[in-house]
Curated annotation (Swiss-Prot):
Source taxonomy: Viruses, Varidnaviria, Bamfordvirae, Preplasmiviricota, Tectiliviricetes
Single GO biological process annotation from the record: symbiont-mediated suppression of host type I interferon-mediated signaling pathway
Region (Interaction with RB1 in competition with E2F1): 43-51
Chain's role: Plays a role in viral genome replication by driving entry of quiescent cells into the cell cycle. Stimulation of progression from G1 to S phase allows the virus to efficiently use the cellular DNA replicating machinery to achieve viral genome replication. E1A protein has both transforming and trans-activating activities. Induces the disassembly of the E2F1 transcription factor from RB1 by direct competition for the same binding site on RB1, with subsequent transcriptional activation of E2F1-regulated S-phase genes and of the E2 region of the adenoviral genome.
Similarity comment: Belongs to the adenoviridae E1A protein family.
Protein's recorded name: Early E1A protein
Source organism per UniProt: Human adenovirus B serotype 7 (HAdV-7)
Any one GO molecular-function label of the UniProt entry: zinc ion binding
Location in or out of the cell: Host nucleus
Motif (PXDLS motif, CTBP-binding): 250-254
Pfam entry (one): Adeno_E1A
InterPro entries in alphabetical order: Aden_E1A
Record-level GO cellular component terms: host cell nucleus
């Protein structure tokens, strides 16, 4: 009962004791009493920030604002020390002091600021300056020349040599072995458009089906003799010509079998 230590040395009434016991029990059991309901919510900082106060006009407001400049008001808010302007020292008894000291606020009057940089770096050497200007002139000339040149398709006698279109592509890409499309096709046409035979012109004789045999076959050509197949195995042969000589039995193209041991 540490709460009773702060009570005066008087007799406690029954009602006060009951209230104290209920408070102790609720505190120990974790059942805190609900906070009292407030009739209205207190204003927040956002409400106070946008709050507009309409008060009576002060006839001395203009004189006070003219006496204390903006720099002095800012110095008072920031706790800085500022030298008062000469006109504020005319009134006796007014002294602008700062108990914090050590800091001074710069003059907040209007001033023109020059943001131009007047510093100069190291001057370039004569060699570097000349090389840079020369490279710039060369690049400009090449760009003007490339823009002024118009692409023209050329067909020289030898593909890839003396061709204006090939030179145009070589200058733009930097590849000396580049060819234009026409020179490439003329140079490699035999790989793509090579004829199948010497004469591909259609003739009325070649279109007939089946074709007619005009020239007789030579007499010394060995022709195979058709043989009716018979049952049984054909004898093995040593060479292909033996098959063309014919025979009583059918041809045997099987290999010879070795006798079993």
């Amino acid at each position: 009962m540490r709460h009773l230590r702060f009570l005066p040395q008087e007799i406690i009434s029954s009602e006060t004791g009951i209230e104290i016991l209920e408070f102790v029990v609720n505190t120990l059991m974790g059942d805190d009493p609900e906070p009292p309901v407030q009739p209205f919510d207190p204003p927040t900082l956002h409400d106070l920030y946008d709050l507009e106060v309409d008060g009576p006009e002060d006839p001395n407001e203009g004189a006070v604002n003219g006496f204390f400049t903006d720099s002095m008001l800012l110095a008072a808010d920031e706790g800085l020390d500022i030298n008062p302007p000469p006109e504020t020292l005319v009134t006796p008894g007014v002294v602008v002091e700062s108990g914090r000291g050590g800091k001074k606020l710069p003059d907040l009057g209007a001033a023109e600021m020059d943001l131009r940089c007047y510093e100069e770096g190291f001057p370039p050497s004569d060699d570097e300056d000349g090389e840079t200007e020369q490279s710039i002139h060369t690049a400009v000339n090449e760009g003007v020349k490339a823009a002024s040149d118009v692409f023209k398709l050329d067909c020289p006698e030898l593909p890839g040599h003396g061709c204006k279109s090939c030179e145009f592509h070589r200058n733009n890409t930097g590849m000396k072995e580049l060819l234009c499309s026409l020179c490439y096709m003329r140079m490699h046409c035999h790989f793509i458009y090579s004829p199948v035979s010497d004469d591909e012109s259609p003739s009325p004789d070649s279109t007939t089906s089946p074709p007619e045999i005009q020239a007789p076959a030579p007499a010394n050509v060995c022709k195979p003799i058709p043989v009716k197949p018979k049952p049984g195995k054909r004898p093995a042969v040593d060479k292909l010509e033996d098959l063309l000589e014919g025979g009583d039995g059918p041809l045997d193209l099987s290999t010879r079998k070795l006798p079993r041991q």
